[in-house]
């Protein structure tokens, strides 16, 4: 819930309600990410201190101009790393900096994915991503990494669209000398048009399916067998 504009209590209540309807009971304590912000900021400062992060003083106008040039060249936007090696003594006094992680530039990183096998990426394509905004609040990739480490997560399973985030988070793990968890990225559910199914496109919720009489056992089996099968077995139980 680090995104204050989109995080609301009713969303949390609905998630827990939907999981219970599916028959998935969480056996741990309820965890609220925003209560751990001080831990996230502490790690950002450690990364800054050990040379794995830096303060970026680019103005909003500079960033927008970089994005505009990338669009004109039909290239994905990657921050140009302007402040990566500039001494802080040269910093402007009227701009509050963000803190960026100093991503590796040379070589490549290999993700040993439990579903997709070895996935390799050129490190130069991973931007120096923001870990602390200029208002001092942490971003998703920092918060999620710190939380997963502190909660001793051994396996992280999520959608294929998070793969680029995994490469970023792996760099934080390595910079902090933390043990890497095992990662698995699963295919996304798409619409008839081939687009990613999204709540922004008015995709149905579990509550919608419940109201029209879909049984949780049926929906679980349907989701499980999307893109996967086990011999001729069609019915699975928790």
Give, region by region, the residue ranges found by the protein language model.
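Active-site cores that bind ATP or allylic diphosphates and position pyrophosphate for catalysis
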Residues: 33, 49-185, 190-197, 205, ...
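A conserved active-site cap/scaffold subdomain adjacent to cofactor or substrate pockets
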Residues: 201, 205-238
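Generic, well-ordered alpha-helical scaffold segments in large soluble proteins
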Residues: 18, 50, 172-175, 212, ...
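A short, structured active-site edge motif that brings together acidic residues
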Residues: 27-35
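Acidic, metal-coordinating catalytic cores used for nucleic-acid/nucleotide bond scission
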Residues: 3-8, 35-37, 162, 190
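N-terminal, positively charged nucleic-acid-binding surface of large information/translation enzymes
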Residues: 1-27, 40-49, 59-62, 70, ...
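Glycine/small-residue-rich interface belts in oligomeric ring/scaffold proteins
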Residues: 6, 10-14, 174, 189, ...
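Short acidic (Asp/Glu) and glycine-rich catalytic loops that position anionic groups and cofactors
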Residues: 22-24, 149-152, 196-202, 218-224
């Amino acid at each position: 819930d680090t995104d204050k504009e989109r995080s609301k209590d009713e969303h949390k209540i609905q998630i827990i309600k939907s999981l219970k309807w599916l028959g998935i009971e969480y056996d741990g304590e309820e965890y609220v990410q925003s209560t751990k912000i001080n831990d996230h900021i502490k790690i950002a400062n450690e990364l800054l201190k050990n040379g794995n992060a830096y303060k970026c003083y680019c103005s909003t106008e500079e960033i927008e101009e970089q994005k505009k040039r990338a669009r004109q060249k039909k290239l994905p936007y990657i921050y140009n790393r302007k402040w990566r090696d500039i001494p802080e003594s040269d910093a402007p006094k009227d701009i509050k900096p963000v803190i960026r992680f100093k991503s590796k530039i040379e070589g490549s990183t290999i993700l040993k994915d439990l579903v997709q096998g070895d996935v390799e990426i050129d490190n130069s394509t991973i931007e120096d991503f923001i870990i602390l905004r200029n208002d001092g609040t942490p971003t998703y990739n920092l918060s999620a990494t710190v939380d997963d480490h502190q909660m001793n997560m051994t396996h992280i399973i999520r959608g294929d669209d998070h793969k680029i985030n995994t490469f970023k988070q792996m760099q934080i793990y390595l910079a902090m000398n933390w043990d890497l968890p095992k990662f698995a990225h699963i295919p996304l559910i798409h619409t008839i048009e081939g687009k990613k199914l999204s709540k922004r496109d008015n995709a149905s919720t579990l509550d919608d399916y419940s109201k029209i009489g879909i049984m949780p056992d049926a929906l679980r089996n349907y989701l499980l067998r999307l893109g996967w099968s086990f011999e001729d077995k069609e019915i699975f139980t928790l």
